[in-house]
């Protein structure tokens, strides 16, 4: 299962990177991917994994150092999935050489964001395949737009 999740996550990250390079994914905040993209990137990955029969929850963790946040996914079997952790490479107080794709046990970067953790259901589990998007919610609209760009051109 870990190998399959890693392959799907790796492919999905490469799709996001290609879409950014091609200037097809210009929805904020993706132009600086992976920086600042953990929330929306995790939501999009959750949708893709959901479509591949893998359900996840989103973990929104806070760092005690500076109250910053980071978001990643976790399966019911406690498999950690993170395609944006490397945004912290080179930042003071953070581990060095953070892998671009983390699938498996929590990595040292996740332990930094363990001060307060909120577990949330990704939108895909509330609105399967974004059929019932709340079009008055800007965040949901951006997620839907981004996912459809990826779906139409890369997936």
Over which residues does each language-model region extend?
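A structural boundary/capping signal
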Residues: 1-155
